[in-house]
């Protein structure tokens, strides 16, 4: 009796699933265009992870990026494979992986090249707090 309880998996904590923000992997130019069009005219911060499947530092940053997406639910997190979407990577002048581009209102507002978790988090926090003061309407 009780065996069903011992084999059941614990439910995720609040906010771990179904939140407004999660990493959205973009696998086509059409999907990129759709997502970019949805965000480029807003004040929402967008963090784009340009990576490659063969890139060791990119793999190291993947769980960090997912964890940040779970915490920063007011930020959009997109993941682009540079081999899959080379045209998008060229548009954003990506030359090394991982490259994290932070954008708001269709413009780049920050960039971190390399697997620098602390710098990425610091930059996201800085830009998140600056959006609350710049997001006021007249």
UniProtKB/Swiss-Prot annotation:
User: What exactly does this protein do?
Assistant: Probable thiol-disulfide oxidoreductase that may be involved in the redox regulation of a number of cytosolic enzymes.
Localization annotation: Cytoplasm
- The SS bond pairs are 55-58
Where would I find the Thioredoxin domain in this sequence? 12-129
Give the protein's recorded name: Thioredoxin H2-1
**Entry-linked InterPro entries:** Thioredoxin-like_sf, Thioredoxin_CS, Thioredoxin_domain, Thioredoxin_H-type-like
Q: Which residues form the signal peptide?
A: none
Name the family: Belongs to the thioredoxin family. Plant H-type subfamily.
Q: Which CDD domains match?
A: TRX_family
Q: What is its main location?
A: cytoplasm
Q: Where is this site: Contributes to redox potential value?
A: 56-57
Residue ranges of region Disordered?
1-20
Q: Which UniProt keywords apply?
A: Cytoplasm, Disulfide bond, Electron transport, Redox-active center, Transport
List the residue(s) that the UniProt entry marks as the site Deprotonates C-terminal active site Cys. 49
> Gene Ontology cellular component?
cytoplasm
Query: Catalytic positions?
Result: 55, 58
